[in-house]
Amino acid sequence: MSSNLVALYLFSIDRSQDEANDVVDRIVEEIVTDRMGIVDLVTSIGEYLTDNNISVRAKAVLLLSQTLGELPKDRLPAKHVSVLLQFYLSRLDDEVTMKENALGIGALLNMQNFPAQKIVDVCKALFSSTDMPKYAQATRLNILKVFETIIDNYLFFISSQTRDAFFSGICSTFAGEKDPRNLMLVFSMLKKILSTFPIDGFEQQFFDITYCYFPITFRAPPDATNLAITSDDLKIALRETLVANDAFSKLLLPALFERLKASTVRIKIDALNIYIEACKTWRVGAYLWSAKDFWESIKQEILNSTDAELQNLALGALNTLASKFYKEEGFSSSFTEFVDMILIQLSQRLLEDVNVKSCGSCAAVFASLASISVETFNYCSCNFLPSVLDLPMVNEPLEKQKGMLVFLEYVYKCLVLLYGKWRSKNQADIDNPLLVYKDKQLSFVSGSLMGTAKDETEIRMLALKVIFLMASIKNFLTESELTMVLQFLDDIAFDFSDPIKKKATECLKDLGLLKPDFLLLTSFPFAFSKLTDDVTAKSSSEETFKQYLSVLVSISEERSLFKALVIRLVEMLKDQFKSKEMSVDLVESIVQSLSVAFKERNDRNEQEIPFFFEELLKQLFTLCFANCESMNVRCLIYVSQTINEIVRVNHFEFQEKFVGQLWKLYMENSNSDLIETEGCEKAAERFTLAASLSDQKFLNLVVLLQGGLNGLSKKLHFIEKLNIELLNLLINVVFVTESPGVKISALRLISSLINKCEKDEDISSFISSKGVTSLWDKVYTGTPKESEAALDVLAWVDKALVSRKHSEGIPLAFKLLDTLNLQNVGDSSVKALSIIIKDDPALSKENSYVEKLLYKQRFYASVSPKILEHISTATGGEKSLYLMLLSNVIGNVPKEIVIPDMPSILPLLLQCLSLSDISVKLSTLNVIHTSVKELTSLLTEYLDTLIPSLLAIPKDMNNPTVVRLLALKCLGSLPEFTPTTNLQLFRDKVIRGLIPCLDDPKRVVRTEASRTRHKWYI
């Protein structure tokens, strides 16, 4: 049996590796079930081991080795393992079977009963019989894997008597390896040896076979797509090996320092990474002797380098060295001598010239040393800062002032790190050494910030950063000084023509997180007084109000500030409604700011919004009901968004209580806790949703109902059960209202209520009810306005069905698709069908809207074939409608599912570029922009149609900025992904055609046109 299997294996191995593996599995099964012994297998292959055909010998050994590798680890007794080991070792002289022999030895080493005392014999045999340079990469890899097993499992069986021979053999065997796959293994094994054993007497040998690979210059060949090893992998492995034993220090560090003085930037970076790793890994004493030499080798890279990465890495290395030095020796004479040497050189450099570059580099070195601890900061400050800070700055050239500000920024960053910010727990016990310079520096920085022309942005930005750091340090500035700084920041942040206003706003926000009480006493009164003055003087526009309020919202991130802001804004709203000269612009700006503020806090997952639930909601509903005649729909929409943000993050019990009160307010003539004033209560008593259908001013309040209900959990009983009465009233609102905002709110609420309903059968029952089926009559026989309203309702209903994968969703979409053939209804049908698949900000998962996995893909797969079928038979205006619909559908589904269909769709999309509908152009351009990268070969077939269309769009000012910009991006991506030979014919036409775009009124378009034009110079 065994001889038959051996013959079958030898026959199969050349034909199919899988067949050969099956034979090995059968042999293993025979041995495990005792139907064959390992001796039988060895006997069966014996005749092949002496065959003159080297291929046959190799196959025979491979069969035995593979079998041993697949056997259970405890299958063979120690006696058999020893015999087989001797068999393999005796064959090491056969170079042609070395690969297979090594595989077998490795399998034996992994056997549970391998006699560990034999490991020395294995090593001796391998060292004496292997000549690594002779072998191919795969053979060397198998040999290295044998050594890997030895080092992983048997290293401690290498005794002190055999250590030297083992080390010598390892150094000889591992030397000169060049293949990156093998090198990774070599580095790994060397690291284990070096980190396990003292290498006394072998430092030079191990260093030579390791450091010879520095620097790593390996780059994977372009065709090596399956090579997983990168240059960075090799660099990391070499680095870890070189620092595995600090016995290398006397050899490695001088070599690295030489590299730092005279090498390319990339090699210097690699050398610094090794040095940093050595400082982190070795005993401090192994490298402290070289501290001065290290500084001399890197100081030019820090003080004069033009490469930021190299400079930052050198500074990091200096900081690591100094930190370890200080931790080991404290303020010893050797440490202070090292620091003094550096500080003296820095002082000399600054005395020679004070400019941005010299100050920045010197300050960075100072920070690397001083930031180690409060004690080191004080020492460095006392020994270095006086010579710098006493330099005259006022009335000096701007370049010199900029340099000093750069220097101060580094210094104060150290102070923030060591002495802590306001509200931080860490505070140094030692007095701040910069307190004696505070008045002078605060005066200088304040003058640079507020006394310099606005257009000197660079120096003012530097001053702003420094003064912010000064204000952040705990107990550094007095209350009056801190107030003064906040006043400076207020002046800048609320001056909308100041180029650094954005940074000033960020500083105010950060200081608000540290000292909110100060902002309440300075920034808030300042901002609200300016708002009040502008309202009184009637000198500001809506845009100005929005800018003021935007800054206030931005700086009110801290909880108490946010609460104060909300209170102030609501009070301002009340005052406006009481005023005889109410500013509609201000009211709209306030409610918009409230909406933005609550959304931003929800996006940041702030936890305090539920605390606004009852009180703020009452005030908002009361204000809106009391002033519904004077509030426009836009204001109500912003209030609705605020209500939604508050309601959706509240817990179940609050939502349950809220929906009950909302029902009382909108559906019953009973008192609701959402209304708080007597006059407003009377108005609310006369109001119901049904009654509002005959009064437009009350009908607008439907917007608030949508905001309140839209964010409710789908687990609420009110949401689980479909409320037919409410849905029918909302459908009537869609037909009655004259406001697009009210209409869209009612439609969104209809979709939300249906989508969240618990039972599919309840939804099916509603769809078959008269209230819905009668809509089809209005689509086909109603007035254009009625048809449009009916289509909108049906589309939003279907949106709810499709997104939750209701069984009637796709059939309803097909019925809507058939309405494109109706006269005077086609445009409305396109818009309605596009709604189904288009994302809506109010109908999202955050509002518990159900969106089943891959629902868009399902819709596309069902509807797109129908659309394409209609396009093939339609003509004239009808075809344009189908093209518009196709573009809208494709533009709102994941691009991955469209790409496979592009060969048939692309010609149709190109026709969409000539349509006047902006949304169609935008969707089409988005798809084309993706296709340029994904389907280059397909697009090249249509360049003569595509390029003229893309050139025409950005020159047409009727197209909005976003469309013109996207068309230019599509044009610009063509030279990046399309073969040059295909574009040469169009080169001159595109370059000339883009000239008008260089004068576009929008800078972003001009910039993109210039960039695109440059790409076409091919």
Swiss-Prot record:
The keyword Repeat applies. It comes from the Eukaryota. One of its GO terms (cellular component) is nucleus. InterPro entries: ARM-like, ARM-type_fold, MMS19, MMS19_C, MMS19_N. Pfam families: MMS19_C, MMS19_N. Its main location: cytoplasm. It is found in: Cytoplasm; Nucleus. HEAT repeats lie at residues 857-895, 899-937, 940-981, 984-1018. One of its GO terms (molecular function) is protein carrier chaperone. SUPFAM superfamilies: ARM repeat. Belongs to the MET18/MMS19 family. This is DNA repair/transcription protein mms19. It comes from Schizosaccharomyces pombe (strain 972 / ATCC 24843) (Fission yeast).
